[in-house]
Amino acid sequence: FVENVDRSKIITAGSIMITRPAVARLRKEGPEVLIRKMKERDITVLPVIDENDKLIGEITLESAAILRRKGIKSIQEAVQSEVHSVTEDTKIEDLLPLITKTNSPIYVVNEERELKGLVPLSSIVVEMTGKDKEEINELIQNAIEL
């Protein structure tokens, strides 16, 4: 019964998202704190939220390092506001077109744009292919290096 079901039409962003991900708080944290957060978690990008937990963009490890080198304490100028976001009920089949346009996670927000979680690209591929996460991460890394 279950073997012929198209998982992409059933599984939602909300069911595979990482809840309570590490974030960058726009007016509260500077580059130094964000660099430490990213290195501790072995990640290269953080969602940026405002004081109301609304998603306003993302910042990369590289951008934070440049700010630190320049001695700039605010992350404002390094925030990339064009990010992909979806709601929790978005089906994986609707996330697929987004993964070809970004190396960043897909952010999950509510109607008020409050950050609810994020979906790593590897999680989408794992759900679609049934391959394990290590195998997928290796494939993604090889593709990025091309």
Which ranges hold each PLM region?
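Short, low-complexity N-terminal regulatory "tails/caps" that precede and couple sensory modules
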Residues: F1-V5
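Intrinsically disordered, low-complexity Ser/Thr- and Pro-rich stretches
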Residues: D6-R7, I59
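Bateman (tandem CBS) regulatory domains
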Residues: S8-V23, G71-V83, T90, L139-L146
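A diffuse structural propensity rather than consistent per-protein peaks
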Residues: T12-A13, G30, T60, S74-I75, ...
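The conserved cystathionine-beta-synthase
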Residues: V23-I43, I49-N52, R68, H84-E112, ...
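Short hydrophobic beta-strand motif reused across regulatory alpha/beta modules
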Residues: I56-A64, K116-I124
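ATP/adenylate-binding site constellation spanning eukaryotic-like Ser/Thr protein kinases
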Residues: L61, R69-I72, Q80, L121
